[in-house]
C-alpha cells in the first residue's frame, strides 16, 4: 500500500525551518465550543444538580431522575471486576500492581515527606507536606474508554494519600465499560458518577448538592472537556491540557525495521494529529523502515488514521550521527522518546527534554502505556522542556514552616525591619521590632 511520509536530511539547507514546520501545532479554539462550555459551566455553577442532570440526560440520551441515581456504588465496580474474562482481569491487576509499586517508590524518592531543621538560636525552619483533600478524575466514555488512564491517574493520587478520589465517566445510552469500572476499583476510586462533558468538569470544580467539589481535576477528554478544564483552572488545579500524542524514535540502525515501523504506528493510530518521527544516521535503514511501513499498514485496523497521521505530521529524518540525533531530540522535547540502539544508556545521558525515555530495542513505548509502572500521563507539544509526567508529587502540596525563637526574633527582626523601612512598609517593620523588645 502506497504511503508518502516526509523525509528530511539534517545536512540539507533549510533543515531547521523544515523541522519547525513538521513540529508546528497550535490547538485551535472553536468559538462555538468555547461559548457552549462557558454557558454550561455558568449554568452548573448557578443551578447545580438540576443543570448537571439536564445536560447529562440530553447529551448522553439518558432518562435519570436525579444526579444521585447517576452514582455507581462500589458493588457495581466489584461486579465489573468479577465479570471480566480471567486474562483481562489478570492483566488489569498486574498493571495496577506495577503502577502502584512504581509510585510507592516515587513517593520515597521524590521529596514527598515533611522536613525541618533547627538553627543555633533555636529557630526552626522546614516544610510540611500535605496530600490534597479531594481529587476529581475525568475518564472519557464511549469508544474512547481507556482503563489504563484510570490506573495512571487514580493510583498516584491514592499513593500520595489523597483523602477522596471522585471519578466521572459518561455512559452514552447507558452503556458502561466494565474495564473502566474495574480499573476504578483497583485504582482506589471512592465515588463514581456516570456524567461527562463540561457539565461534569463544572460539577467537580464548583460542587453540587450531590457531587462534591474537588481540589484538582485530572484526566483526558475531548475539546469540550479541555475547554472546561482551562476555564475552571484557578478555582481548582488541573493536571495539564494535553495535545496530540507524540513519539520520537532515535535508532542507530541495529533494530528490526518492522519493530520501528510498528512503534511509529503505535502513536499514529491515536488520531490524525498524532506525531511519529524517526531520527537515524543510517539512510539504508530508513529505507527499510519505509518499506516495513508500507508492508505492515494494510494489516492495521486503524490504517486510515495511521496513514493520515504519518502523511500529515510524521517524518523520517536522516541525521549525521547519534550525537546530532540527541541534540535534535532535545529541541523536539517529545512526549515519548525511544532510544532503540545497542548502547542506549550512552545516548540517554545526552537527553535533557522528554516526557518518558524508553531505552533499548526491547522497550516498546506501548509497555510504558500500559504496565511498565511509570506514569503514561506525559507532557506534549514541547512542554517536556519544563513539565514532568503525572506523579505522586502532583497530589501533594508544600507549606513552609517557621518557628522563631526569642533570640532569633532579635536577629531576624533587625534584618526584616531594615528591609521593610526600605520598602516603605512601616507596619511590617514595627511588627518585627515589637518582638525585638519582648
UniProtKB/Swiss-Prot annotation:
Catalyzes the sequential NAD-dependent oxidations of L-histidinol to L-histidinaldehyde and then to L-histidine. Substrate binds at residues 245, 267, 270, 336, 369, 423, 428. NCBIfam families: hisD (TIGR00069). One of its GO terms (molecular function) is histidinol dehydrogenase activity. Keywords: Amino-acid biosynthesis, Histidine biosynthesis, Metal-binding, NAD, Oxidoreductase, Zinc. The active site is at 335 (proton acceptor), 336 (proton acceptor). Pathway: Amino-acid biosynthesis; L-histidine biosynthesis; L-histidine from 5-phospho-alpha-D-ribose 1-diphosphate: step 9/9. Gene3D superfamilies: 1.20.5.1300, Nitrogenase molybdenum iron protein domain (3.40.50.1980). Zn(2+) binds at residues 267, 270, 369, 428. CDD domains: Histidinol_dh. Pfam families: Histidinol_dh. This is Histidinol dehydrogenase. Its EC number is 1.1.1.23. PANTHER family: HISTIDINE BIOSYNTHESIS TRIFUNCTIONAL PROTEIN, HISTIDINOL DEHYDROGENASE HDH. The keyword Ribosomal protein does not apply. The gene is hisD. One of its GO terms (cellular component) is cytosol. It comes from the Bacteria.
Amino acid at each position: 500500500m502506497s504511503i508518502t511520509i516526509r523525509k528530511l536530511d539534517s545536512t540539507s539547507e533549510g533543515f531547521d525551518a523544515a523541522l519547525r514546520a513538521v513540529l508546528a501545532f497550535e490547538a485551535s479554539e472553536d468559538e462555538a465550543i468555547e461559548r457552549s462550555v462557558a454557558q454550561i459551566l455558568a449554568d452548573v455553577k448557578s443551578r447545580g444538580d438540576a443543570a448537571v442532570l439536564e445536560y447529562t440526560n440530553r447529551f448522553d440520551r439518558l432518562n435519570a431522575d436525579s444526579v444521585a441515581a447517576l452514582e455507581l456504588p462500589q458493588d457495581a465496580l466489584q461486579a465489573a471486576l468479577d465479570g471480566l474474562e480471567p486474562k483481562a482481569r489478570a492483566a488489569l491487576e498486574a498493571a495496577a500492581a506495577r503502577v502502584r509499586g512504581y509510585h510507592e517508590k516515587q513517593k520515597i524518592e521524590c521529596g514527598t515527606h515533611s522536613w525541618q531543621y533547627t538553627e543555633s538560636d533555636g529557630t526552626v525552619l522546614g516544610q510540611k507536606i500535605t496530600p490534597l483533600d479531594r481529587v476529581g478524575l475525568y475518564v472519557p466514555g464511549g469508544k474512547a474508554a481507556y482503563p489504563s488512564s484510570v490506573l495512571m491517574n487514580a493510583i498516584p493520587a491514592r499513593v500520595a494519600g489523597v483523602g477522596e478520589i471522585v471519578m466521572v465517566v459518561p455512559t452514552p445510552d447507558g452503556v458502561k465499560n466494565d474495564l473502566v469500572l474495574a480499573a476504578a476499583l483497583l485504582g482506589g476510586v471512592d465515588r463514581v458518577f456516570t456524567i461527562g462533558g463540561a457539565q461534569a468538569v463544572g460539577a467537580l470544580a464548583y460542587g453540587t448538592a450531590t457531587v462534591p467539589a474537588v481540589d484538582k481535576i485530572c484526566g483526558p477528554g475531548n475539546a469540550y472537556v479541555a475547554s472546561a478544564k482551562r476555564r475552571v483552572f484557578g478555582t481548582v488545579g488541573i493536571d495539564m491540557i494535553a495535545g496530540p500524542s507524540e513519539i520520537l524514535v532515535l535508532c542507530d540502525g541495529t533494530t528490526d525495521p518492522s519493530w520501528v515501523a510498528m512503534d511509529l504506528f503505535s502513536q499514529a493510530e491515536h488520531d490524525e494529529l498524532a506525531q511519529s518521527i524517526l531520527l537515524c544516521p543510517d539512510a539504508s535503514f530508513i529505507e527499510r523502515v519505509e518499506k516495513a511501513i508500507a508492508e505492515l499498514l494494510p494489516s492495521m485496523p486503524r490504517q486510515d488514521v495511521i496513514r493520515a497521521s504519518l502523511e500529515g505530521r510524521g517524518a523520517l529524518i536522516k541525521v549525521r550521527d547519534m550525537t546530532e540525533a540527541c541534540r535534535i531530540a532535545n529541541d523536539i522535547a517529545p512526549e515519548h522518546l525511544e532510544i532503540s540502539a545497542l548502547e542506549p544508556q550512552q545516548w540517554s545521558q545526552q537527553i535533557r527534554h522528554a516526557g518518558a525515555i524508553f531505552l533499548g530495542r526491547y522497550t516498546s513505548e506501548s509497555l510504558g502505556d500500559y504496565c511498565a509502572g511509570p506514569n503514561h500521563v506525559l507532557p506534549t507539544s514541547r512542554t517536556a522542556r519544563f513539565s514532568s509526567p503525572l506523579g505522586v508529587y502532583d497530589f501533594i502540596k508544600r507549606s513552609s514552616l517557621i518557628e522563631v525563637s526569642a533570640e532569633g526574633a532579635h536577629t531576624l527582626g533587625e534584618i526584616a525591619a531594615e528591609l521593610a523601612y526600605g520598602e516603605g512598609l512601616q507596619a511590617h517593620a514595627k511588627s518585627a521590632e515589637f518582638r525585638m523588645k519582648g
